[in-house]
């Protein structure tokens, strides 16, 4: 097909017809219709134009190498033996490669050019080698000439020294001959000389030294070591040449000892080991341990020290401590928060506090129009709850706290996050211990008090008595010139409720509570629990900013994205503003009640801060373990005698677990102690049971139950499991169990006293004391004491008791009897025999 139309070519190359016509016009081909024909020459012209426009070579690339593969098949008949033939298929493969002549010529030209370059490079290299060789020869000649000149100078110096030595020897020889002539004896005889044989010298280290020593020992042919010199005076004329000594090289690593102690600036983190502290002060670890022992702390080289202890040690050793703050990430988080200038009023956070059973929850129920008190176990509040109430005059956020003594930490947390504290006091009961404690918490938090005198509908109500008792604790009503509002209310009839709300709103208006409603949210964890279906659930009171669904939340060491937010009524919301209590789903675990919750920009940053807090918490925990301290050594030695009751506590919420753990730990005494192995939130699972098995502990479930797998394991291992819903019952039963593990106590009671009037001898029993019972009664087989002059001389057992040769079990006062004491024969007249019995006494804590 030599000619094709424009449309056909566009279909083949896959381009629009209009685009192809435009490219043909740009290439100089006069075609402007879709059905116009295009020749092969026009196709090549278009291809050259496109190559040129794309930056490629205009020449059409042609293959430089062609490879042809050819296969042929045939069959041959092969004799298979036995008159049979076999057909074999034969395949012949042929491969031929044809190379374009121009490509071969190009390769030859490239090879020739490369060969010429190599030859030129070899010539240059040979020239450089020749020049280097000539330079080396000239240098060798110069060095040879210098050596020859040195050798000649040395020979001349040697000849001069030899001539001087020869002249010196001749002069000494003449002097020697003259002296010999003067000292020669008259008879002409010379006494024979005796020489000691020379001792063998040590082998020289070098051969040259060996040769020199041999030459010196050979001497002259006459056997003398020097010419014309007597052997005894051979060394007198020699003088050693003066040789200048080389100065000793200075020590490379030499240093001068400091004349005064060096004072270091020691940076101290929050926790560090003894070895790290010693390294920073440039001293040995033993010095630091010695300083710690002076402070009364037994430490090892790997002991973790807290910042305060390390600071004292550094100061004691004469250095300057510098405390390091490791909360850089925390400070960056605070600085990264958006500062919003617009401030808005928020609802007042009101905490209801008071003694147990004074009607706090009932009062809040009437305000909320709900029935929470009826659902509380035992009729007492054991959880901290947060509720938001809307009235005609404004919104109020209420926090209900438990009144029982075990929930002190809960009340303290409630007072910290509050603006106003409502102190509920029963009009018929007055101020009680938890009432006074609530006053102290409110003062510590700096929150104003509003006293609600409850139960005024009772006939024995006495509001004036309440005012008088509270005045003793510096809570004075406005009627008496104080600054505290007193409102008489009744949670049963609703009397005074409106006055109480009005008093709260008035107090909030005076305080002018304003915060920023924009920017990242910040709040505090009121309570947390582990829900079986939803996972960790935390009740958070938003204090500033706006918390939205999907935010990254950081609380203590737990992080997570807010998956859902629920109100106290179970309604799901998208966002929560200031003073709004919400339940949060999505955290990685249950945070501790009282932890601060803050929104972080990204998840990576949140995990980094949480990891840093977790490591810091672990280091602080290790630092607090003072197992090696001197004051704990004796306690550890005595622990073998102290009975311990191990407990594994699981509760529905974090606050209850904390309160129960603290209350049970306080039951410990010198005789028995309660050790909480673990306290957590959520149902009882297999992990808790295995922990109880390993530590021999009792499992306590507070408003939680064990799952099926845990129940099977409990039945298999025989673990003691107790369920409680009221904290009173848990404390009472654990107290009883603590008494049960103590050893029983025995008290000795004297039941009789007998006086020995005579002593008889019995062949069977030995000494028999004839006694008169003067007090009580004497019983057989009871333990006795023998008293002599009111001093105990023997303790033993009463073996026989007779009256007129008859064995009796008991002899009363005023009756005579015979008493045989077991294993004691030294009874004397006038002794007293005291009979007593051991009475078991129930132990007490």
From Swiss-Prot:
Residue ranges of the region described as Disordered: 139-253
Segments for region (G4): 454-457
GO MF annotation, one: guanosine tetraphosphate binding
Protein name: Translation initiation factor IF-2
Function of the protein: One of the essential components for the initiation of protein synthesis. Protects formylmethionyl-tRNA from spontaneous hydrolysis and promotes its binding to the 30S ribosomal subunits. Also involved in the hydrolysis of GTP during the formation of the 70S ribosomal complex.
Entry keyword Hydrolase: no
Family according to the record: Belongs to the TRAFAC class translation factor GTPase superfamily. Classic translation factor GTPase family. IF-2 subfamily.
SUPFAM superfamilies: Initiation factor IF2/eIF5b, domain 3, P-loop containing nucleoside triphosphate hydrolases, Putative DNA-binding domain, Translation proteins
Domain tr-type G: 345-512
Region (G1): 354-361
Gene name as annotated: infB
Compartments it resides in: Cytoplasm
Signal peptide location: none
Compositionally skewed regions (Basic and acidic residues) per UniProt: 139-198, 206-228
InterPro entries: DNA-bd_dom_put_sf, EF-G-like_DII, EFTu-like_2, IF2_assoc_dom_bac, IF2_II, IF2_N, P-loop_NTPase, Small_GTP-bd
Region (G5): 490-492
Annotated segments matching region G3: 400-403
Keyword terms: Cytoplasm, GTP-binding, Initiation factor, Nucleotide-binding, Protein biosynthesis
Gene Ontology CC terms, in alphabetical order: cytosol
Region (G2): 379-383
Binding positions for GTP per the UniProt entry: 354-361, 400-404, 454-457
Record bears the keyword Cell membrane: no
Xref: Pfam families: EF-G_D2, GTP_EFTU, GTP_EFTU_D2, IF-2, IF2_assoc, IF2_N
């Amino acid at each position: 097909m030599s000619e094709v139309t424009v449309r056909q070519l566009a279909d083949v190359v896959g381009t629009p017809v209009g685009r192809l016509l435009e490219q043909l016009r740009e290439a100089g081909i006069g075609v402007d219709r879709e059905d116009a024909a295009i020749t092969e020459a026009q196709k090549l012209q278009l291809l050259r134009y496109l190559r040129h426009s794309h930056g490629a070579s205009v020449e059409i690339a042609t293959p430089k190498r062609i490879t042809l593969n050819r296969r042929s098949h045939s069959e041959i008949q092969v004799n298979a033996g036995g008159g049979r033939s076999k057909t074999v298929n034969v395949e012949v493969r042929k491969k031929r490669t044809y190379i374009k002549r121009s490509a071969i010529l190009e390769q030859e030209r490239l090879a020739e050019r490369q060969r010429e370059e190599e030859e030129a490079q070899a010539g240059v290299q040979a020239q450089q080698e020749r020049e280097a060789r000539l330079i080396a020869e000239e240098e060798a000649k110069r060095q040879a000439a210098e050596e020859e000149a040195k050798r000649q100078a040395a020979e001349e110096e040697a000849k001069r020294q030899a001539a001087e030595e020869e002249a010196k020897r001749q002069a000494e020889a003449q002097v020697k001959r003259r002296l010999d002539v003067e000292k020669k004896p008259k008879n002409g005889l010379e006494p024979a000389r005796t020489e000691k044989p020379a001792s063998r010298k040590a082998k020289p280290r070098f051969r040259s030294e060996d040769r020199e020593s041999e030459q010196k020992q050979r001497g002259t042919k006459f056997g003398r070591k020097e010419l014309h010199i007597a052997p005894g005076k051979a060394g007198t004329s020699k003088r050693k040449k003066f040789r200048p000594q080389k100065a000793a090289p200075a020590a490379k690593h030499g240093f001068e000892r400091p004349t005064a102690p060096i004072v270091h600036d020691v940076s101290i983190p929050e926790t560090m080991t003894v070895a790290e502290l010693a390294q920073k002060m440039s001293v040995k670890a033993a010095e630091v341990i010695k300083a710690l022992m002076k402070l009364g702390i037994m430490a090892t080289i790997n002991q973790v020290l807290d910042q305060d202890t390390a600071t004292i040690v550094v100061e004691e050793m004469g250095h300057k401590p510098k405390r390091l703050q490791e909360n850089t990430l925390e400070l960056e988080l605070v600085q990264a928060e958006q500062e919003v200038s617009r401030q808005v009023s928020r609802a007042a956070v009101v905490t209801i506090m008071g003694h147990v059973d004074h009607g706090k929850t009932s009062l809040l129920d009437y305000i909320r129009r709900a029935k929470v008190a009826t659902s509380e176990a035992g009729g007492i509040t054991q959880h901290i709850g947060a509720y938001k109430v809307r009235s005609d005059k404004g919104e109020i956020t209420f926090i209900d706290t438990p009144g029982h003594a075990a929930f002190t930490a809960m009340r303290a947390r409630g007072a910290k996050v509050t603006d106003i504290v409502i102190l509920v006091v029963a009009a018929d009961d007055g101020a009680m211990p938890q009432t006074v404690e609530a006053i102290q918490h409110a003062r510590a938090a700096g929150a104003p008090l509003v006293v609600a005198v409850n139960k005024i509908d009772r006939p024995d109500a006495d509001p004036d008595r309440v005012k008088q008792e509270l005045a003793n604790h510096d809570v004075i009503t406005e009627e008496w010139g104080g600054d505290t509002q007193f409102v008489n209310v009744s949670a049963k009839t609703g009397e005074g409720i409106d006055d109480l709300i009005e008093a709260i709103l008035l107090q909030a208006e005076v305080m002018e509570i304003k915060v920023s409603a924009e920017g990242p949210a910040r709040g505090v964890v009121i309570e947390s629990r582990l829900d079986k279906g939803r996972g960790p659930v935390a009740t958070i009171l938003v204090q500033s900013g706006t918390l939205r669904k999907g935010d990254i939340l950081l609380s203590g060491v737990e992080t997570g994205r807010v998956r859902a937010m629920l109100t106290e009524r179970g309604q799901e919301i998208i966002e929560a503003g200031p003073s709004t209590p919400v339940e949060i789903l999505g955290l990685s675990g249950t945070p501790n009640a009282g932890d601060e919750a803050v929104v972080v920009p990204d998840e990576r940053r949140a995990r980094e801060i949480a990891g840093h807090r977790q490591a810091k918490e672990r280091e602080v925990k290790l630092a607090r373990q003072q197992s090696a301290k001197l004051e704990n050594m004796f306690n550890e030695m005595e622990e073998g005698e102290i009975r311990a009751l191990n407990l594994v506590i699981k509760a529905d919420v974090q606050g209850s677990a904390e309160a129960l753990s603290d209350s049970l730990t306080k039951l410990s005494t010198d005789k028995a102690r309660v050790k909480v192995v673990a306290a957590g939130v959520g149902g009882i699972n297999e992990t808790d049971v295995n922990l109880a098995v390993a530590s021999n502990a009792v499992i306590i479930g507070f408003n939680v139950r064990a799952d099926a797998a845990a129940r099977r394991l409990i039945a298999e291992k025989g673990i003691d499991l107790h369920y409680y819903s009221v904290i009173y019952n848990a404390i009472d039963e654990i107290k009883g169990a603590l008494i049960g593990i103590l050893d029983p106590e025995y008290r000795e009671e004297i039941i009789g006293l007998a006086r020995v009037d005579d002593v008889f001898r019995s062949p069977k029993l030995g000494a028999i004391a004839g006694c008169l019972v003067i007090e009580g009664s004497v019983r057989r087989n009871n333990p006795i004491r023998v008293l002599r002059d009111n001093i105990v001389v023997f303790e033993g057992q009463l073996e026989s008791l007779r009256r007129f040769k008859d064995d009796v079990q008991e002899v009363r006062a005023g009756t005579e009897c015979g008493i045989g004491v077991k294993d004691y024969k030294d009874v004397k007249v006038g002794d007293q025999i005291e009979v007593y019995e051991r009475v078991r006494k129930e132990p007490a804590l």
